[in-house]
């Protein structure tokens, strides 16, 4: 008995979902294969398709000549006490504020640069 593709397709058209499911299982067992679709693993996105950054870190890279004014600006921006703000300024490069919006990061950067500090936004 020769296999005829048209006859097989005609038989499959008349089969129920349950019968087709059993057929798939039988083929998987007989030929040691899987009917599951392979899942493609996505690599890192290309530069143009990368997500836009929404959270930024403002980092003090250097205090500059007006250290006292920089400490005051850090205190105002973060709500830190004098000792903590001084520790941030003395520990430069150090993050001043993390996970802030772009607007807040730019405003903080401008305020710190206005008093002579060197600042980067990451």
Curated annotation (Swiss-Prot):
Stored SUPFAM superfamilies: ClpS-like, Ribosomal protein L7/12, oligomerisation (N-terminal) domain
Q: Which CDD domains match?
A: Ribosomal_L7_L12
Which GO biological-process labels does this protein carry? translation
The protein's matches in InterPro entries, at most eight in alphabetical order, are given as: Ribosomal_bL12, Ribosomal_bL12_C, Ribosomal_bL12_C/ClpS-like, Ribosomal_bL12_oligo, Ribosomal_bL12_oligo_N_sf
Tell me where on the tree of life, at the top rank, the source sits: Bacteria
Molecular function terms, GO-annotated:
mRNA binding; structural constituent of ribosome
One Pfam match, given by its short name, reads Ribosomal_L12_N
Keywords (A to Z) from UniProt: Ribonucleoprotein, Ribosomal protein
**Does the entry feature the keyword Glycoprotein, yes or no?**
no
Query: What are its GO cellular component terms?
Result: cytosolic large ribosomal subunit
* Keyword Ribosomal protein attributed: yes
Instruction: Give the similarity note.
Output: Belongs to the bacterial ribosomal protein bL12 family.
What function does this protein fulfil? Forms part of the ribosomal stalk which helps the ribosome interact with GTP-bound translation factors. Is thus essential for accurate translation.
What is annotated about its quaternary structure and interactions? Homodimer. Part of the ribosomal stalk of the 50S ribosomal subunit. Forms a multimeric L10(L12)X complex, where L10 forms an elongated spine to which 2 to 4 L12 dimers bind in a sequential fashion. Binds GTP-bound translation factors.
The identity of this protein, by name, is Large ribosomal subunit protein bL12
């Amino acid at each position: 008995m020769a296999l005829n593709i048209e006859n097989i397709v005609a038989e499959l058209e008349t089969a129920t979902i349950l019968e087709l499911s059993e057929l798939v299982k039988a083929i998987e067992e007989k030929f040691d294969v899987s009917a599951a679709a392979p899942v493609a693993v996505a690599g890192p996105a290309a530069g143009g398709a990368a997500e836009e950054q929404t959270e930024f870190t403002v980092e003090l890279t250097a205090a500059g000549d007006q250290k006292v004014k920089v400490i005051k600006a850090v205190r105002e921006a973060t709500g830190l006490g004098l000792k903590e703000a001084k520790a941030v300024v003395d520990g430069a490069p150090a993050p001043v504020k993390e996970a802030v919006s772009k607007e807040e990061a730019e405003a903080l950067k401008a305020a710190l640069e206005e008093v002579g500090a060197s600042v980067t936004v990451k």
